[in-house]
Regions:
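N-terminal secretory signal peptides and thylakoid transit peptides that target proteins
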Residues: 1-15
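C-terminal segment of classical bacterial N-terminal signal peptides
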Residues: 18-24
């Protein structure tokens, strides 16, 4: 298998794990209006449709610490600590959320074709679309369009605090659906997947302390 195909496969199999970073997104250069997330974590729970793609490649997934694998009655998920994140969570209009972040830990995807260690997970959310990049077996990928983030379909809980003060935010069960670009890249490398842009590949839950800009 070529290095390019390995990278595409590793990214595609781990794609649902590149998710949405606790309601934040793109660009430290916008810190005049972007706050920060601290004490954060992101949990990515993939759907039966995503599991079917893993099964197609006879793939198993394990977490790389400090990320951890969660298996319970609701299915399988991986929880990642948030290393850094900046953005505007747009608490009164979640679909407008934007920002960027990095996750600690990673995943190991094992298939008969090889082992893929996916680390250095980064994600950017802008205009409702999540892009991401990572390192696959140490080789850095470029930023790729991955998912449409259904932030408006998630559930938001935020503890009331005085204006301008840090507040704890939790957003749950945000659906991720593949973008046309991510499906095109997968199709070019491996043939058409059994999913469409309407398929929910994962649900993301995130929590952290949001500190508004200027604090």
């Amino acid at each position: 298998m070529s290095a390019t195909r390995r990278t595409v496969l590793g990214t595609a199999l781990a794609g649902p794990l590149l998710g949405h970073l606790a309601g934040t997104a793109a660009g430290a250069d916008k810190n005049d209006r972007f706050g920060t997330i601290s004490e954060g974590w992101v949990e990515v729970r993939w759907t039966p449709q995503a599991q079917a793609q893993l099964d197609r490649f006879q793939a198993t997934v394990q977490a790389i610490a400090p990320a951890r694998l969660i298996e319970d009655e609701a299915g399988t998920a991986i929880r990642f600590p948030v290393r850094t994140a900046t953005g505007d969570p747009a608490l009164t209009n979640l679909p407008k959320a934007q920002g960027s972040g990095r996750l600690d830990g990673g995943v190991v995807v094992r298939t008969p074709m090889g082992e893929f260690r996916v680390t250095e997970l980064e994600s950017v959310l802008e205009s409702g679309q999540t892009s991401g990049r990572c390192a696959v077996n140490g080789a850095q990928t470029s930023m790729q369009s991955l998912f449409i983030c259904g932030a408006g379909e998630g559930r938001l809980v935020a503890q009331p605090v005085p204006a301008g003060q840090p507040l704890k935010v939790r957003i749950s069960d945000v659906p991720l659906r593949p973008t046309p670009e991510s499906l095109s890249a997968f199709t070019t490398a491996f043939g058409a997947p059994a999913v469409t842009t309407d398929t929910v590949m994962a649900y993301v839950t995130g929590e952290g302390v949001y500190t508004p800009p200027g604090r």
